[in-house]
């Protein structure tokens, strides 16, 4: 017995592919129905400026996919979501403890991949710093979003507070992707950092998601009808409605919005009532749609290349890349 213990403690921990398969089940479940690959398509387009070699690009893509899908596992637990991509969420199949552990495990698997991006110590240190900074930002934003929801009506965020939260929550993974690529890029001819562009893209992405959750049938089939209301989420239209009714002194409507959010209801009729308030009483859905279009136009009308890559000396590349990026933006503005 002592010999076996001695052998055990003098070697690395034993791990098998069978063990790996077991603890990866919640993660593999979410992969059964892939997402729309928006982030991977964006990486491919941005790499037309960054010019990362294929091996590095593949690793960055893998890091992003691991982080994105793992964050969805945690999101679904935090939101008590029944559906993800039209199928039962992982935590309802494998349990909350296993799903949390798997998601956290995949975060560290993603961190482990960073070491494969370079053998140069200063660059590796920079990449790990970027990784840590943006995961911290992501959790800060997610934490605020949850706090506002779970302790409503203690804090009713303003639009500015909401946008700052999204810069952390949604912007974190967008920025992590871009900053890794910029740090690794052998090219410098794009003229300026694309972080402002990616920040704006992240804001558009999140507000559009908030809007479609209340309006889009396809999203209803994948996540459940107006699931943000069941969650009690302070999404962009809800934030506008609460501030609008408060400013206008519409106490009855203000309290009704709060009441429905606090119900955490799955009742379709009650959720439709709140949507009607947002549609007709506070005009919050129209305001949200208009706000998205304003943000999109900041990019589409960017004649000075404040946000888009500056590729004046590479006119063919610039034209094609700008067209592709504007196509992505147009897709995000389809409501």
Curated annotation (Swiss-Prot):
<dbReference type="GO" id="GO:0046872">
    <property type="term" value="F:metal ion binding"/>
</dbReference>
<feature type="binding site">
    <location>
        <position position="233"/>
    </location>
    <ligand>
        <name>dimethylallyl diphosphate</name>
    </ligand>
</feature>
<comment type="similarity">
    <text>Belongs to the FPP/GGPP synthase family.</text>
</comment>
<keyword id="KW-0653">Protein transport</keyword>
<feature type="binding site">
    <location>
        <position position="84"/>
    </location>
    <ligand>
        <name>dimethylallyl diphosphate</name>
    </ligand>
</feature>
<keyword id="KW-0813">Transport</keyword>
<feature type="binding site">
    <location>
        <position position="79"/>
    </location>
    <ligand>
        <name>Mg(2+) 2</name>
    </ligand>
</feature>
<feature type="binding site">
    <location>
        <position position="79"/>
    </location>
    <ligand>
        <name>Mg(2+) 1</name>
    </ligand>
</feature>
<feature type="site" description="Important for determining product chain length">
    <location>
        <position position="107"/>
    </location>
</feature>
<feature type="binding site">
    <location>
        <position position="36"/>
    </location>
    <ligand>
        <name>isopentenyl diphosphate</name>
    </ligand>
</feature>
<dbReference type="GO" id="GO:0004311">
    <property type="term" value="F:geranylgeranyl diphosphate synthase activity"/>
</dbReference>
<dbReference type="GO" id="GO:0005739">
    <property type="term" value="C:mitochondrion"/>
</dbReference>
<keyword id="KW-0125">Carotenoid biosynthesis</keyword>
<dbReference type="GO" id="GO:0015031">
    <property type="term" value="P:protein transport"/>
</dbReference>
<feature type="binding site">
    <location>
        <position position="68"/>
    </location>
    <ligand>
        <name>isopentenyl diphosphate</name>
    </ligand>
</feature>
<feature type="binding site">
    <location>
        <position position="223"/>
    </location>
    <ligand>
        <name>dimethylallyl diphosphate</name>
    </ligand>
</feature>
<keyword id="KW-0414">Isoprene biosynthesis</keyword>
<dbReference type="GO" id="GO:0004337">
    <property type="term" value="F:(2E,6E)-farnesyl diphosphate synthase activity"/>
</dbReference>
<dbReference type="GO" id="GO:0033384">
    <property type="term" value="P:geranyl diphosphate biosynthetic process"/>
</dbReference>
<dbReference type="InterPro" id="IPR008949">
    <property type="entry name" value="Isoprenoid_synthase_dom_sf"/>
</dbReference>
<feature type="binding site">
    <location>
        <position position="206"/>
    </location>
    <ligand>
        <name>dimethylallyl diphosphate</name>
    </ligand>
</feature>
<dbReference type="Pfam" id="PF00348">
    <property type="entry name" value="polyprenyl_synt"/>
</dbReference>
<comment type="pathway">
    <text>Isoprenoid biosynthesis; farnesyl diphosphate biosynthesis; farnesyl diphosphate from geranyl diphosphate and isopentenyl diphosphate: step 1/1.</text>
</comment>
<feature type="binding site">
    <location>
        <position position="39"/>
    </location>
    <ligand>
        <name>isopentenyl diphosphate</name>
    </ligand>
</feature>
<feature type="binding site">
    <location>
        <position position="75"/>
    </location>
    <ligand>
        <name>Mg(2+) 1</name>
    </ligand>
</feature>
<dbReference type="GO" id="GO:0045337">
    <property type="term" value="P:farnesyl diphosphate biosynthetic process"/>
</dbReference>
<dbReference type="GO" id="GO:0004161">
    <property type="term" value="F:dimethylallyltranstransferase activity"/>
</dbReference>
<feature type="binding site">
    <location>
        <position position="170"/>
    </location>
    <ligand>
        <name>dimethylallyl diphosphate</name>
    </ligand>
</feature>
<dbReference type="InterPro" id="IPR033749">
    <property type="entry name" value="Polyprenyl_synt_CS"/>
</dbReference>
<feature type="binding site">
    <location>
        <position position="85"/>
    </location>
    <ligand>
        <name>isopentenyl diphosphate</name>
    </ligand>
</feature>
<comment type="function">
    <text>Catalyzes the trans-addition of the 3 molecules of IPP onto DMAPP to form geranylgeranyl pyrophosphate. Required for the membrane attachment of YPT1 and SEC4. May be involved in vesicle trafficking and protein sorting.</text>
</comment>
<keyword id="KW-0963">Cytoplasm</keyword>
<dbReference type="GO" id="GO:0016114">
    <property type="term" value="P:terpenoid biosynthetic process"/>
</dbReference>
<keyword id="KW-0808">Transferase</keyword>
<feature type="binding site">
    <location>
        <position position="169"/>
    </location>
    <ligand>
        <name>dimethylallyl diphosphate</name>
    </ligand>
</feature>
<feature type="binding site">
    <location>
        <position position="213"/>
    </location>
    <ligand>
        <name>dimethylallyl diphosphate</name>
    </ligand>
</feature>
<protein>
    <recommendedName>
        <fullName>Geranylgeranyl pyrophosphate synthase BTS1</fullName>
        <ecNumber>2.5.1.-</ecNumber>
        <ecNumber>2.5.1.1</ecNumber>
        <ecNumber>2.5.1.29</ecNumber>
        <ecNumber>2.5.1.10</ecNumber>
    </recommendedName>
</protein>
<comment type="pathway">
    <text>Isoprenoid biosynthesis; geranyl diphosphate biosynthesis; geranyl diphosphate from dimethylallyl diphosphate and isopentenyl diphosphate: step 1/1.</text>
</comment>
<dbReference type="GO" id="GO:0033386">
    <property type="term" value="P:geranylgeranyl diphosphate biosynthetic process"/>
</dbReference>
<keyword id="KW-0479">Metal-binding</keyword>
<dbReference type="InterPro" id="IPR000092">
    <property type="entry name" value="Polyprenyl_synt"/>
</dbReference>
<keyword id="KW-0460">Magnesium</keyword>
């Amino acid at each position: 017995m002592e010999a076996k213990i001695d052998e055990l403690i003098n070697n690395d921990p034993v791990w098998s592919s069978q063990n790996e398969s077991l603890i990866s089940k919640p993660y593999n479940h979410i992969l059964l129905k892939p997402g729309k690959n928006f982030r991977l398509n964006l990486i491919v387009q941005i790499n037309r400026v960054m010019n990362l070699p294929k091996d590095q690009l593949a690793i960055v893509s893998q890091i992003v996919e691991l982080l994105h899908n793992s964050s969805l596992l945690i999101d679904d637990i935090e939101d008590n979501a029944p559906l993800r991509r039209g199928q039962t969420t992982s935590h309802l199949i494998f349990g909350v403890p296993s799903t949390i552990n798997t998601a956290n495990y995949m975060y560290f698997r993603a961190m482990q991949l960073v070491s494969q991006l370079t053998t140069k110590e200063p660059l590796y240190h920079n990449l790990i710093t970027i990784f840590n900074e943006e995961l911290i930002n992501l959790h800060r934003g997610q934490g605020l979003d949850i706090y506002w929801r779970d302790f409503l009506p203690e804090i009713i965020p303003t639009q500015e507070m909401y946008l700052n939260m999204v810069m952390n929550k949604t912007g974190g993974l967008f920025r992590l992707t871009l900053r890794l690529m910029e740090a690794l890029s052998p090219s410098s001819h794009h003229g300026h950092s694309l972080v402002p562009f990616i920040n704006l893209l992240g804001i558009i992405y999140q507000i559009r998601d908030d809007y479609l959750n209340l309006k889009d049938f396809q999203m209803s089939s994948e996540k459940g009808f107006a699931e943000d209301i069941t969650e009690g989420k302070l999404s962009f239209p809800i934030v506008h409605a609460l501030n609008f009714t408060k400013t206008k002194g519409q106490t009855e409507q203000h309290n009704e919005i709060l009441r429905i959010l606090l119900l955490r209801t799955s009742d379709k009729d009650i959720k439709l009532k709140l949507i009607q308030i947002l549609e007709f009483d506070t005009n919050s859905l129209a305001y949200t749609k208009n706000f998205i279009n304003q943000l999109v136009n900041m990019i589409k009308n960017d004649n000075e290349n404040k946000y888009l890559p500056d590729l004046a000396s590479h006119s063919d590349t610039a034209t094609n890349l700008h067209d592709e990026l504007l196509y992505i933006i147009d897709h995000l503005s389809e409501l």
